Swiss-Prot record:
Enzyme Commission code(s) on record: 5.4.2.12
Keyword Isomerase: yes
Organism of origin: Geobacillus thermodenitrificans (strain NG80-2)
GO MF, any single term: phosphoglycerate mutase activity
Name assigned to this protein: 2,3-bisphosphoglycerate-independent phosphoglycerate mutase
Recorded metabolic or biological pathway in which this protein acts: Carbohydrate degradation; glycolysis; pyruvate from D-glyceraldehyde 3-phosphate: step 3/5
CDD domains given in the database record: iPGM
Enzyme class: isomerase
Family annotation (InterPro entries): Alkaline_phosphatase_core_sf, BPG-indep_PGM_N, Metalloenzyme, PGAM_B_sf, Pgm_bpd_ind
UniProt record similarity statement: Belongs to the BPG-independent phosphoglycerate mutase family.
């Protein structure tokens, strides 16, 4: 029996904007996309900011886009989850934070807050530190010490003074907190097993060892004089008038590590939490009975308490298709294969029953502007065979070109990339229509729509422009206010399947 597949076709990095200058999507000759756009119900979707679980105004990316598409709901990223918790008052009721504060009140000990001291939003956000200071003041914790990791990478290389001054203002405002140590992230946030770096940060915090300064700003000035900028500032100790450290981490203290991204938080956390730690000698004063809090789940190896536990994504599109006994195919070239598999399945590696995957190798070139078609033709050829074989009820396909070539910031190759994808799109959609199937043509975020700045310089980053959605079915109407999280419910609707309660997105088809 002939299958009538519903195919979700993701044109990676393909968004829409009216301005045609520097816009490879608008300038490309794409007769197939234009034909489907004119002939079938279409709309645009928001693919950035809070619509995909990021802070407002922040551009989307492929990982976040595919997570939202597959989950059929807004998947809040860690930064946004914490921001919302602060905004709605949940942060102050967080049981893990309150337990850490009760621990130090019961033992008459100190609370240490450490993390990256910037608003870069990649590993941490300084506003989360301020929220912790405010909470400590509210909870009556008297001894609160800050161990600031200096950034200079996700923000400018000499921005530490502005963050330190801002922090000092907040300390005055809340009446709690003192800066105890400062360390460039090169030391305290190493992830490459350079344990000699981590040891320097550890010994500053626990033993008060390292260069000493009366004033945190003096530490930065001194480093700058020696040509050492924020990221590389040596772990340094702030001292009182008598030369003793403002604070060291001791037995029965509590630590709240307010970074939310795990990769650069794991080593320093292991140093404090692992009883069988062997990477360097922690010495006789290694603190015992520490109450160690990670803002998010860092790793199974970190023996600490987690303030914001991971959210499990149940009933993603793949799981629902599988539960209903449908056959599904995921297909992409190497660059976007993890996105149509792992991210589309909510961070799950294993296939669901009835799920097949086809990986087509991306071309071995230094940069994709040298081969703008990438492996789109090979992906298409493989998929056409599968459509002809009548095996699948649902297909999820990604074309990587507009994004990967768009990252070059070169207009001509990106136009060629869009044109190659359009040629392939025509073949795939026509094959699906011949089988009586339906295609949902969309994208995960923008990129190729803006590859030059207004001044004509390369613009290599993603954009915040809306992405298209076309459903190749006559006689329906699409909502105009959709988000990526509405695509899975739409797919289920077209397949005649019920939408699980976990999917809080809504079908784009107007009822």
């Amino acid at each position: 029996m002939s299958k009538r597949p519903v195919a979700l076709i993701i044109l990676d990095g393909f968004a829409l904007r009216e301005e045609t200058y520097g816009n490879a999507v608008a300038q490309a000759n794409k007769p197939n996309f234009d034909r489907y756009w004119n002939e079938y119900p279409h709309a645009t979707l928001k693919a950035c900011g809070e619509a995909v679980g990021l802070p407002e105004g922040q551009m989307g990316n492929s990982e976040v886009g595919h997570l939202n598409i597959g989950a059929g709901r807004i998947v809040y990223q860690s930064l946004t989850r914490v921001n919302i918790a602060i905004r709605e008052g949940e942060f102050d009721r967080n049981e893990t934070f309150l337990a850490a504060m009760n621990h130090v009140k019961q033992h008459g000990t100190s609370l240490h807050l450490f993390g990256l001291l910037s608003d870069g939003g990649v590993h941490s956000h300084i506003h989360h530190l301020y929220a912790l200071l405010r909470l400590a003041a509210k909870e009556g914790v008297k001894r609160v010490y800050i161990h600031g990791f200096l950034d200079g990478r996700d923000v400018g290389p000499q921005t530490a003074p502005q963050y330190i001054k801002e922090l000092q203002e907040k300390i005055k405002e809340y009446g709690v907190g003192e800066i105890a140590t400062l360390s460039g992230r090169y030391y305290s946030m190493d992830r490459d097993k350079r344990w000699e770096r981590v040891e320097k940060a550890y010994r500053a915090m626990v033993y008060g060892e390292g260069p000493t300064y009366r004033d945190p700003l003096e530490c930065i000035e001194d480093s700058y004089k020696n040509g050492i900028y924020d990221e590389f500032v040596l772990p340094s100790v702030i001292v009182r008038e008598d030369g003793s450290p403002v604070a060291t981490i001791q037995d029965n203290d509590a630590i709240i590590f307010y970074n939310f991204r795990p990769d650069r938080a794991i080593q320093i956390s292991n140093t404090f939490t692992n009883e069988d730690f062997r990477e360097f000698d922690r010495g006789p004063k290694h603190p015992k009975n520490l109450f160690f809090v990670c803002l998010t789940h860092f790793s199974e190896t970190v023996k600490g308490y987690v303030a914001f536990k991971p959210t499990n994504l149940d009933n993603t599109i793949g799981e629902v298709l599988s539960q209903h006994g449908l056959r599904q195919l995921r297909i992409a070239e190497t660059e976007k294969y993890p996105h149509v598999t792992f991210f589309m399945s909510g961070g799950r590696e294993e296939k669901f029953p009835g799920e097949d995957r086809i990986l087509i190798n991306s071309p071995k070139v230094a940069t994709y502007d040298l081969k703008p078609e990438m492996s789109a033709y090979e992906v298409t050829e493989a998929l056409l065979k599968e459509i002809a074989a009548d095996k699948y009820d649902a297909i999820i396909l990604n074309y990587a070109n507009p994004d990967m070539v768009g990252h070059s910031g070169m207009l001509e190759p990106t136009i060629k990339a869009v044109e190659a994808v359009d040629e392939c799109l025509g073949k795939v959609v026509d094959a699906i229509l011949e089988k009586g199937g339906i295609a949902i043509i969309t994208a995960d975020h923008g990129n190729a729509d803006e590859v030059l700045t207004p001044e004509g310089k390369p613009q290599t980053a993603h954009t915040t422009n809306p992405v298209p959605v076309i459903v190749t079915k006559h006689g329906i109407e699409l909502r105009k206010d959709g988000i990526l999280g509405d695509l899975a419910p739409t797919m289920l609707d077209l397949l005649g399947l019920p939408q699980p309660k976990e999917m809080t997105g809504k079908t784009l088809i107007v009822k």
